[in-house]
Amino acid sequence: MVVWVGVYAILPPPTTPYILSEGLKNGSIRRTWVSVDDMAPVLLRSVVAAEDANFCLHWGFDMRQLRAAIADGGNRGASTLTQQTVKNVWLWHGRSWPRKALEATFTPIAELFWSKRRILEIYLNMAEFDTGVFGAEAAAQHHFGRRAADLTAIQAALLAAVLPNPKERQAVNPSSATQRRASAIADGAATIRRDGRSDCFE
């Protein structure tokens, strides 16, 4: 396990169980690995603002969000970006105690071996942004006809807004709810830059 995480600190993960299953189901997938240096910085901030605003402040688990989720009866998500990255790379989708146990085991190891910037790089190359469309580069080309490096702030926010439900939400021709979500994400991305919560990956 430790060796596996260590290898992916240097090399890109070739694929994931979910990407393989989607490829078999759909016949093909779109995915192009790019360095985090070839992604617009505002995309990184937007995804962090949308999914894990305290990403730079925790070691893989956001205990405050976890306590809030427990108090809410488990009806709200509390997974950090590190947990989501671990799930995306090694585990299967769906909720089960065995999967959660493996996720809890892998997460601190990933935090130990990977920088925050590396975690975001892997996450943004593995996340699904539409049916069969994986990674920021393929998503930027698919939705906006441009490279991930050239995304505008609102385009970055729209991509972040479809997470984690890309089969229901659309970055192009978004619903009013998705537009509101993207607007809030754009504000959040500016906020975490201003207050220093993006310093660990900038």
Where are these regions (language model features)?
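Juxtamembrane regions of bacterial inner-membrane/periplasmic proteins
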Residues: 1-202
